[in-house]
Amino acid sequence: MKNRRLCVFISFVLCCISVLAYSEGSHNNSVNKKTSEKSKKPTLMILPSDHWCEQRFYMTTWDNQGVKVKSPDYQTAFLQDRELTQVISNLGQLLTIQGYTLKDAEQETKAIFKRIAEDNVTMSATSGSVIAESPLDMIKKAAKMDILIQIDWNINSDRSVTFTLEAFDSYTSKRIATATGTGKPSNQILPVMLEQAIKSKIKDFDKQINQYYADCNKHGREIILTVKCWANWDGNLEMENEEGDELIDVIKKWLHKNAVNGAFNLSDATENFALFEQVRIPLFDEEGYAIDARDFATLLRKYIKKECDLTSKVMTRGLGEAIIVIGEK
């Protein structure tokens, strides 16, 4: 009898230990996942600066709804400048050592420029209304990098090289880090000269990026959200629901609940247009997947459909700007 009671007691203890171990393991997995997300470094892409492209005549034009706009021709630059690929590769190695993941700029630009002629506008399936995107906007959206690194350099008369390194948030185009310097005179090839000159500045450059990204983790990433009405729709943002709330108020309430810390700024508004700037969105969703402006705007589009029974279309310009146009697809 005593042996039986002892066996039951031991079984109970082992069961409790198993439950506690499973619970602790699940908790640790959850903590590790959150820690991993917070410690994850942003994804980078390196491109030559606009000034570098302009000085070497690597420029192209694109049609922004009837207006010709100049933009760097990255595809031609990669094809014709023999040193560019090696410069970017060497800089990429320095940044990889700092823990960053890099997107292949040359391959991404090849893929994008193949379809620029047909994809440089997004339009309404109903009325044919359009929104234009620059080649760089398209590269950002396709590559989905967090940070764009641009490099510029000049070889001096004494065979030293002066460089400028800048980092831009791909979502807002804000400059978030910069480094400049001049290397020692050298007879090395340009890519090696640049690498040696940049090495002494890379730690501080990395620190600036980390500080910015830590702020994004804490306070959310900025995007721009525009709400418009199709011209052939008979409603507007001042139309009221059954509770007497205008459509613009319904949208603002949703943003207060879904933006990080309810942070956004209604910069401009009319009955047919609303511009929300400094909208803070989380870097990742609950599953750990990265969120961009389209993802966030799509959630709002679904909410407008559910609450107001209104059809709308989400369009984007790059990663950090979304436009919701209400009234049709």
Spans of features found by a protein language model:
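N-terminal segment of the mature soluble domain
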Residues: Y58-E133, K141, D245-F284, G288-K305
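Amphipathic beta-strand/beta-sheet edge segments enriched in Tyr/Trp
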Residues: A143-N187, R317-K329
